[in-house]
Design a protein with these regions (language model features):
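Basic/aromatic-rich interaction segments and small domains that mediate binding to polyanionic partners
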Residues: 4, 8-52, 57-58
């Protein structure tokens, strides 16, 4: 599944709601606020699922 920039996602195993900020070669860059600052990390697209605020499936 590919994600679009600005889409909301979460890690399949659970975790914070994150916003997609980039996508390249199957890796999805996400950012989120952890209560102290903005965090950034890249995940393989298979590790993520669409969040509540995501676009409907086509």
């Amino acid at each position: 599944m590919s994600f679009m920039v600005s889409e909301e996602v979460t890690v399949k195993e659970g975790g914070p709601r994150m916003i997609v900020t980039g996508y390249s070669s199957g890796m999805v860059e996400c950012r989120w606020y952890d209560g102290y600052g903005v965090k950034r990390e890249a995940f393989h697209e298979t590790e993520l699922v669409p969040g509540e605020g995501s676009r409907p499936a086509e």
